[in-house]
């Protein structure tokens, strides 16, 4: 069916506008969102935001899609393996709303690149990266931005299987999450702390132990994980020696919960 972009957007937002009202829909459409990491959490967050009406979104990730991404990452399919993650996700988002402005940045967030992202230009910043060092740096920088810029962070989504244990909470009050604990310990050792409170999505479920073996290291081929993706590993290091299992039923809820925090915050603003 041949539908104009304007007609498509107007039609797709009827249910959103019916629930939230035209004024709130307009606020959502004007919001500028920056997402660091578009893997199992960030990809679902991005789609949920665009479907909810967000028109201006920047997605950041350095990796290409590999086979193992297909169990949990939105844009990862048999046809997209090998493609740049942010480009594949952009294609998906523009199919949903061709009027959206989706900026792709195929680069790593780290201390050396942080200034290049111009975070002060955005209304909302989402942390969906796994590297402990880079995550800590992003938290410190994002919470030091002006208070009108809202920062939301994802804690550990791997090694869980119960979707009903996913919660939101203030970073310093999170219990039972090893990644949050590792971050807090890192801040305490460095005696450098986030400048303000911020919300996180996390799970109250005790992390499981991997019940299987990493086939990439148990066979003749390591192509499964050849993309060099930032993956949650033992102690959140950059080593590929141990990769933790994860499920879409958890990572997707993390991403959609972050999107929900953002949409609700927009609606509640006066």
Question: What is each PLM-predicted segment?
Answer:
Residues 1-34:
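N-terminal charged helix/coil linker that caps or initiates catalytic domains
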Residues 2-6, 120-124, 129-137, 149-151, ...:
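Glycine-rich phosphate/adenylate-binding loop
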Residues 35-37, 60:
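Conserved N-terminal Rossmann-fold NAD(P)-binding element of oxidoreductases
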Residues 41:
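Hydrophobic/small residue at the entry helix of a nucleotide-binding pocket
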Residues 51-56, 147-148:
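Conserved S-adenosyl-L-methionine
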Residues 54, 59-97:
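Glycine-rich phosphate-binding loop and adjoining beta1-alpha1-beta2 segment
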Residues 68-75, 159-170:
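Acidic/polar active-site rim loop that often engages polyanionic ligands
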Residues 105-114:
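Conserved SAM/SAH-binding loop
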């Amino acid at each position: 069916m041949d539908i104009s972009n304007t007609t498509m957007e107007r039609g797709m937002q009827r249910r959103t506008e019916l629930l939230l009202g035209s004024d709130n829909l307009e606020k959502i459409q004007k919001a500028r969102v920056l997402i660091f990491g578009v893997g199992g959490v960030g990809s679902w967050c991005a789609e949920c935001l665009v479907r909810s009406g967000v028109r201006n979104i920047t997605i950041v990730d350095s990796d290409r899609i590999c086979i193992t991404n297909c169990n949990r990452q939105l844009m990862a399919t048999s046809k997209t393996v090998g493609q740049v993650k942010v480009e594949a996700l952009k294609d998906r988002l523009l199919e949903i709303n061709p009027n959206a402005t989706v900026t792709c940045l195929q680069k790593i967030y780290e201390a050396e690149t942080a200034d290049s992202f111009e975070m002060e230009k955005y209304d909302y910043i989402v942390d969906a990266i796994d590297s402990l060092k880079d995550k800590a740096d992003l938290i410190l920088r994002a919470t030091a931005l002006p208070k009108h810029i809202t920062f939301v962070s994802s804690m550990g989504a791997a090694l869980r299987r119960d979707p009903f244990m996913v919660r939101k909470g203030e970073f310093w009050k999170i219990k039972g999450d090893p990644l949050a604990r590792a971050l807090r310990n890192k801040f305490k050792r460095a005696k450098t702390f986030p400048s303000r409170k911020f919300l996180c999505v996390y799970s109250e479920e005790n992390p499981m132990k991997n019940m299987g073996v990493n086939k990439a290291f148990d066979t003749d081929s390591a192509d499964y994980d050849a993309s060099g993706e930032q993956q949650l590993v033992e102690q959140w290091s950059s080593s590929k020696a141990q990769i933790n299992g994860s499920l879409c039923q958890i990572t997707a809820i993390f991403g959609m919960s972050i999107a929900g925090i953002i949409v609700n915050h927009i609606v509640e603003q006066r």
